[in-house]
Amino acid sequence: MVGHDYRLPRITSAMLVLTHGCNLECRYCFVQQNPCHMTFETAMRATNFLIQNADRENLVPSINFFGGEPMLMWDEIIVPLTNWIRNEYQKPFSLSITTNGTLLNKEQIEFLTQNRIGVLLSIDGDKETQDYNRPLHNGGSSFDILKDVIPLIVEYRPGTTFRMTTIPKTCEHVFENIQFAQESGFKSFFVIPNVFEKWSDEKRGILAKEMRKYSDYYIESFRDGVEPIRFSEIDKGFVAIRQINSAIDAKEYRTSNKCKSYGKCGLGASRFASIDPNGNLYACQEMTSNEGEQSIFYIGNIFDGERDDLRYRLMNLYDSSQASGEDCSSCKLNRVCDGGCVANNYMITGSVNKLPEMYCWWQRLLLDEAIYIMQTLGTEENDMFRKRWVNVV
């Protein structure tokens, strides 16, 4: 139980949901698409809300332009708000955007670069995978648009992450799509299975083989002295190995600080929130278009401020001692489990404390791949890998 004597931090960082609309119709999207757009006035109020809180906390405010597809609001919000922040506010302010990339052109990418706006590109792979997973509303090809955008992103924004979601129908192409990302010039990727979909044992086996292909490629790259395209979850796996060993030595259980509600994403307990087009505050961006103000993830609005009573209520719904999956007792991660994504837990299982079985399976797979890589390259005393290990853990 988290008491009111715990001081909740002011919200200084936000996913600014500019619209619930999108030009794509992705098969797995959590957004309930509708023509609800944020006004520039609301965007300014949200920005000043974050600035005022950041000033009180002596921190740098930050915004991630989010959607739907935020590029639909390029002229209405992104350009004028960015110009105000960079040219009139003129103090440090972190800006980024999560986009499907299909509405980007050279001029816009140059604007993002000049104004130091970070980019996370949501793209699932080559033409076959991208067009199946992420078609246009009319069923047309989104890849045919992106093929001309990708070289511009790589040229102007070389640090952009290639962010993939995989589904059972296309999971046999995961490693091909990782290779596509690398060959296109990306230095890092992120992939996650759609946990809202049913995964058969056969499809899980295929996905596991795809990730082993990546691990083998990773190992061969280090043997050749070449930097592989990076997957941050593998680095997290290296950290988990150290945490698990430390927890075993100390006879501790669930040592990860992420198990504490006041340090966990999605519980309204941090400096982060999502702001919907109407100015409402939510603990997670996945909930802004799903349940409205009746949601347990609703925590106030930018006009009246955060509702700390609602934040405490949400925090106290989460209990790391109860957070569980299908078979925790034999799970390699049971000492350092972070309790999963509370929003996904809630939407799939009905409880913030109950993890989807597919999430657990995926986390165990990633740990197994990290162990496989570590044991192989560690046994070979690969110096390049040793330096990576030291830097990561």
Regions found by a protein language model. Give the residues of each.
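Canonical Radical SAM [4Fe-4S] cluster-binding loop centered on the CxxxCxxC motif
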Residues: 6-42
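Radical SAM/AdoMet-radical enzyme domain recognition
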Residues: 47-66, 73-201
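Short, small/polar residue-rich loop motifs at catalytic or cofactor-binding pockets
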Residues: 265-269
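C-terminal accessory region of radical SAM enzymes
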Residues: 210-253, 286-332
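Short glycine-enriched, charge-decorated loop/helix-capping segments at active-site entrances
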Residues: 32-36, 132-140, 348
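Radical SAM enzyme core and accessory elements
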Residues: 1, 278, 289-292, 322-393
